[in-house]
């Protein structure tokens, strides 16, 4: 309790000074480069243990810091260790904003569904402060009262990924979903599976079976995973068809930071099973050209830069849905080495990627017109 009290006191101080917090480390400005306490402040409160996932949340961090450099704002990025700690951070900030008497502009960003109920219950408290604003993502349901929301539709990009997964995959294609409840996860999985089912397989000599697997049955579960659990899942998928015989596996990990435990399991066994691979999700993972078939990406870092710019101009939209047509999502094919060809050349010979993108955009839009 004492540590929590100290942490909350530190946040209180940081809200009115010029520092940046990453995890448990507080960075003070370089001497001679101090920013005035009147400089606009962007505060991000991540979900529990989500920063450091090397994908979605790390891209948000990257985007916020890029915006700080571009626009000259201060940043405070908080990585709570538990939901309780994150809620305590939020309560401290809301209380301070209710009582603040200065005119410093502050934007609070919450990129986690863990805080959904709290945000929707308390966001109106910020209406007492004309200089405080809120950005909650990702959700399809706008906030009542103060605050903006946006949603990045992953269906189209994942549809492309499902079509492309036919090329270079043998035996088993395993889609790992964090849970069946989180909307972003569920719709991403639906898009990938639809794209896969709508496309012909590249070679009938090498049949492929699609296997969908959930990591958790909890509404916000499945985004973290122990290495031992990942190794068990890996071995189960390796023997999906037979206990006596190994099969090739391609993993599609739509499960946040848990994907990296799967990657470690895959790389640990790479000398034994050199045909196993994965599809990178959220971030560009094509640097791993031995194992990453291609990447389906969310450009959340660029979206954050744009939104902070809109906030500074006082033109942040109340709600917005972005997707493949907006450039908020896409696929990256560079890097993968297969039969002597890099990823882009390999897919270009087999798929009309421009036409596929247009089909995927249409599929994404059609879902909202029904």
Where are these regions (language model features)?
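C-terminal motif of bacterial Sec signal peptides marking the signal peptidase cleavage site
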Residues: 15-18
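Extracytoplasmic "Venus flytrap"
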Residues: 36, 42-63, 67, 76-87, ...
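Periplasmic-binding protein-like
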Residues: 44, 100-113, 135-137, 241-256, ...
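An alpha-beta-alpha
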Residues: 64, 159-207, 212, 319-349
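Flexible loop/hinge segments that line or gate small-molecule binding clefts
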Residues: 127-153, 283-289
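Hydrophobic alpha-helical segments within soluble ligand-binding/sensing domains
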Residues: 149-173, 296-316
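Extracellular/periplasmic Venus flytrap/periplasmic-binding protein
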Residues: 184-246
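Flexible loop/turn connectors
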Residues: 274, 283-339
């Amino acid at each position: 309790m004492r540590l929590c009290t100290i942490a909350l006191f530190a946040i209180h101080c940081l809200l009115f000074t010029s520092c940046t917090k990453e995890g448990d480390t507080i960075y003070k400005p370089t001497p001679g480069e101090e920013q005035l306490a009147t400089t606009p402040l962007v505060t991000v409160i991540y979900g529990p243990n989500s920063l450091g996932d090397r994908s979605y949340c790390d891209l948000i961090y990257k985007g916020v810091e890029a915006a700080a450099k571009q626009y000259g704002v201060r940043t405070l990025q908080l990585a709570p260790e538990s939901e309780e700690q994150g809620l305590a951070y939020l309560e401290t900030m809301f209380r301070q904003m209710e009582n603040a008497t200065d005119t410093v502009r502050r934007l609070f960003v919450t990129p986690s569904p863990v805080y959904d109920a709290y945000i929707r219950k308390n966001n109106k408290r910020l209406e007492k402060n004309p200089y405080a604003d809120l950005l909650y993502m990702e959700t399809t349901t706008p906030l009542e009262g103060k605050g903006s929301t946006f949603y990045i539709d992953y269906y189209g990009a994942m549809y492309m990924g499902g079509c492309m997964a036919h090329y270079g995959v043998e035996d088993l294609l395993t889609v790992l979903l964090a849970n069946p409840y989180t909307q972003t996860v569920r719709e991403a999985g639906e898009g990938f599976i639809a794209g896969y089912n709508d496309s012909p397989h590249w070679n009938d000599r090498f049949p492929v079976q699609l296997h969908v697997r959930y990591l958790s049955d909890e509404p916000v579960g499945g985004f973290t995973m122990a290495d031992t659990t990942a190794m068990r899942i890996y071995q189960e998928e390796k023997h999906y068809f037979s206990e006596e015989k190994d099969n090739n596996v391609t993993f599609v990990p739509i499960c946040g930071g848990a994907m990296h435990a799967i990657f470690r399991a895959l790389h640990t066994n790479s000398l034994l099973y050199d045909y196993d691979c994965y599809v990178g999700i959220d971030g560009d993972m094509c640097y791993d050209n031995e194992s990453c078939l291609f990447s389906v990406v969310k450009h959340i870092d660029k979206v954050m830069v744009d939104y902070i710019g809109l906030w500074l101009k006082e033109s942040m939209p109340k709600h917005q849905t972005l997707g493949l047509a907006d450039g908020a999502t896409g696929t990256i094919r560079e890097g993968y080495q297969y039969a002597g060809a890099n990823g882009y050349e390999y897919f270009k010979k087999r798929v009309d990627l421009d036409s596929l993108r247009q089909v995927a955009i249409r599929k994404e839009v059609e879902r909202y017109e029904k």
